[in-house]
Amino acid sequence: MPSWIGAVILPLLGLLLSLPAGADVKARSCGEVRQAYGAKGFSLADIPYQEIAGEHLRICPQEYTCCTTEMEDKLSQQSKLEFENLVEETSHFVRTTFVSRHKKFDEFFRELLENAEKSLNDMFVRTYGMLYMQNSEVFQDLFTELKRYYTGGNVNLEEMLNDFWARLLERMFQLINPQYHFSEDYLECVSKYTDQLKPFGDVPRKLKIQVTRAFIAARTFVQGLTVGREVANRVSKVSPTPGCIRALMKMLYCPYCRGLPTVRPCNNYCLNVMKGCLANQADLDTEWNLFIDAMLLVAERLEGPFNIESVMDPIDVKISEAIMNMQENSMQVSAKVFQGCGQPKPAPALRSARSAPENFNTRFRPYNPEERPTTAAGTSLDRLVTDIKEKLKLSKKVWSALPYTICKDESVTAGTSNEEECWNGHSKARYLPEIMNDGLTNQINNPEVDVDITRPDTFIRQQIMALRVMTNKLKNAYNGNDVNFQDTSDESSGSGSGSGCMDDVCPTEFEFVTTEAPAVDPDRREVDSSAAQRGHSLLSWSLTCIVLALQRLCR
């Protein structure tokens, strides 16, 4: 070989060997990256025209790159913002479902109460005239307390309804006996005979069962919509950890630094990143699904035996029927009251000249349960419940499905059909690691996100607890019990405010134990039911001991 050839080739070989491994002889242009970077709204002054050495990079591969330190920082922040927006957009359906349906149900129930009160007032003004108007506060107080209960007030429905019928009996008793004067003490004695005499027939018992369980179901269902709305709103606002932000940057924008701005992440790569970043949200799913199941069960009650619309629409007719019963049995009722409370004093001559009002003989049209009027809320309860049930079913498993929903978005990943020409975190090639399972504990070996599985997110745990408490309330409402007002009464309607199925066969109930709160009477005095419970327990224990002793004596 001529000496001049060696003199040329050897220096060239030395130059080639001195280049970094894998580098091009000529640095590639960053034109595509500049265009994509500028489209994001960033200044082009940050970005070089050609690739530069990448030793300064902290997240992306330290090879020849189009990213400066400033670019990597800005793109890290951009990836965080985009992730937060993705989660919020993906959970948009469940959030709007609870927001819009809560508004519709709340409007419906409030207007239903307003319409029922107006209907009763109009009917009773036409029928009883001044007699009703002089005693209208009894009925106004009834609706005031029903509204207060619905909006979360500390109202014991059973005691409130008992008080209503007792007050109505006092007023009615005076009207059917105008020839007598009744003192406050005498009227108090009269009210004590309400249960014994049953002056209003069976209407109070049936109405108590219907009203209590319908209102318990309605109030609890709306509370459930409120809790679902609040949990969905809170959980959709994520705060990614530093480890998550690094993984997001590497997945979304390290392709920019490698000069591959149009190459999207591999689908499985995206899933592992999202499962790591949303590990705590996935743990919400179990309690969320139980909450949705309980909401669906109460929704079925609202369609059937606990339908508040079918209770409130004819309430004026039912109360009127009770008044008719009282009027028809007035002589027997008066005689028994006089026997128990004593003979009242005669009234002054002017008042005793009045006779029992003829108005009570008026009859009202029978209520047709097929008449289901709509309200200004736009629909009847049946249609509202059917709609919400469909939406609730679609919201199950929403939190564990977030990674799949996000990674299915064509604007985020290359899709499942393009597994070779996608970004795998290092280069444009197939992503090989296996996909992690859902939840925090399953991220211990996540190859993309550094997750501390020993420190569950406190905020998410608070939402889990809120759902658990609400689910328990819904289970009680399903069984006709108000979790805040359960008593130990032995009425045929069963224990607990609003329980009982009348002549129906009760469906299978949840087995659930609640913490019993003391009932509260209209004067806000606590009624200690624990003493009665202790008495029953002591009696049972004593009887058991006696039986055992007798058995021994007989041996």
Curated annotation (Swiss-Prot):
<feature type="region of interest" description="Disordered">
    <location>
        <begin position="348"/>
        <end position="376"/>
    </location>
</feature>
<dbReference type="GO" id="GO:0043202">
    <property type="term" value="C:lysosomal lumen"/>
</dbReference>
<dbReference type="GO" id="GO:0009986">
    <property type="term" value="C:cell surface"/>
</dbReference>
<keyword id="KW-0472">Membrane</keyword>
<comment type="function">
    <text>Cell surface proteoglycan that bears heparan sulfate. Putative cell surface coreceptor for growth factors, extracellular matrix proteins, proteases and anti-proteases. Enhances migration and invasion of cancer cells through WNT5A signaling.</text>
</comment>
<comment type="similarity">
    <text>Belongs to the glypican family.</text>
</comment>
<feature type="propeptide" description="Removed in mature form">
    <location>
        <begin position="530"/>
        <end position="555"/>
    </location>
</feature>
<keyword id="KW-0654">Proteoglycan</keyword>
<dbReference type="GO" id="GO:0005796">
    <property type="term" value="C:Golgi lumen"/>
</dbReference>
<dbReference type="InterPro" id="IPR001863">
    <property type="entry name" value="Glypican"/>
</dbReference>
<dbReference type="GO" id="GO:0045202">
    <property type="term" value="C:synapse"/>
</dbReference>
<keyword id="KW-1003">Cell membrane</keyword>
<keyword id="KW-0964">Secreted</keyword>
<keyword id="KW-0325">Glycoprotein</keyword>
<feature type="signal peptide">
    <location>
        <begin position="1"/>
        <end position="23"/>
    </location>
</feature>
<dbReference type="GO" id="GO:0098696">
    <property type="term" value="P:regulation of neurotransmitter receptor localization to postsynaptic specialization membrane"/>
</dbReference>
<dbReference type="GO" id="GO:0015026">
    <property type="term" value="F:coreceptor activity"/>
</dbReference>
<keyword id="KW-0336">GPI-anchor</keyword>
<dbReference type="GO" id="GO:0098552">
    <property type="term" value="C:side of membrane"/>
</dbReference>
<dbReference type="InterPro" id="IPR019803">
    <property type="entry name" value="Glypican_CS"/>
</dbReference>
<dbReference type="GO" id="GO:0016477">
    <property type="term" value="P:cell migration"/>
</dbReference>
<feature type="compositionally biased region" description="Low complexity">
    <location>
        <begin position="348"/>
        <end position="357"/>
    </location>
</feature>
<keyword id="KW-0242">Dwarfism</keyword>
<dbReference type="GO" id="GO:0005634">
    <property type="term" value="C:nucleus"/>
</dbReference>
<dbReference type="GO" id="GO:0009966">
    <property type="term" value="P:regulation of signal transduction"/>
</dbReference>
<keyword id="KW-0357">Heparan sulfate</keyword>
<protein>
    <recommendedName>
        <fullName>Glypican-6</fullName>
    </recommendedName>
</protein>
<feature type="region of interest" description="Disordered">
    <location>
        <begin position="480"/>
        <end position="501"/>
    </location>
</feature>
<keyword id="KW-0449">Lipoprotein</keyword>
<keyword id="KW-0732">Signal</keyword>
<dbReference type="GO" id="GO:0005886">
    <property type="term" value="C:plasma membrane"/>
</dbReference>
<feature type="lipid moiety-binding region" description="GPI-anchor amidated serine">
    <location>
        <position position="529"/>
    </location>
</feature>
<dbReference type="GO" id="GO:0005576">
    <property type="term" value="C:extracellular region"/>
</dbReference>
<dbReference type="Pfam" id="PF01153">
    <property type="entry name" value="Glypican"/>
</dbReference>
